[in-house]
C-alpha cells in the first residue's frame, strides 16, 4: 500500500509533525573565518531555550498551568514565636484587644427657657447695661423717632451697631404706646398733619415756579 504524500504547509489529519531539513533553512552569507556561537547553531528543528536556574531561595514548585515567570516566590517562614498552628484560631503569642465601645458625643443641656423669652434668646437679643439704657432713655424723652444720623451717634456713644439702636427705639415706642394709648392717637394725628402740610408746601412751590396762585385751605 502506497503511503500518502505529505506536503509542507498542508497538515493532514493524524499526520506526524513536519520537520524541515537542514538545507531548507535560510542561512545568511558569512565569511569563512566567522564562527557561529554554539547557542545560535541551527539544528534540524527549532529548540526552545531552557529558562535560567533560579537561586535556591527562589526556587518554586513547577505548576503546569502557570508559567514560570508568573509564579510568585513563597514567603519566608515566620519565627517560632510567631508561628500559628493550623488548628488553633488564634496564636497564643498574639494578644487581641477588644474594640473600644462607641461613646456618644456629650451634649451639654441648655437652660430651660419657655415662652417669649425662649424666642428672644434664640434671636440673640442685645442686652444693654444700666448706663446704656439711661443714655437711650434720655434721648427717647427728647425724640421718639431719631434720624439715621442721630442713631449713628447714639450707636457710637453706647458702643453698639446702628441697626441695634433702630430696633431698640422700635421696641421702646411699641411699649410706650401700649402704656399710653392716647399718645398713639396724637402721633397719628401729627403724622397726618405733617403729610398734609408737606403736600401744601409742595403745591406752593410748584405754583410759584409757574406763576399761578394757589389758595391755602
Curated annotation (Swiss-Prot):
GO terms for cellular component: nucleus. It is found in: Nucleus. Its main location: nucleus. The keyword Phosphoprotein does not apply. Pfam families: Homeodomain. Keywords: Developmental protein, DNA-binding, Homeobox, Nucleus, Transcription, Transcription regulation. Residues 121-180 bind DNA. Gene3D superfamilies: Homeodomain-like. Specifically expressed in early embryos. GO terms for molecular function: DNA binding. Residues 190-217 are annotated as: Disordered. Belongs to the paired homeobox family. Obox subfamily. Transcription factor required for zygotic genome activation (ZGA), a critical event in early embryonic development during which the developmental control passes from maternally provided mRNAs to the expression of the zygotic genome after fertilization. This is Oocyte-specific homeobox protein 8.
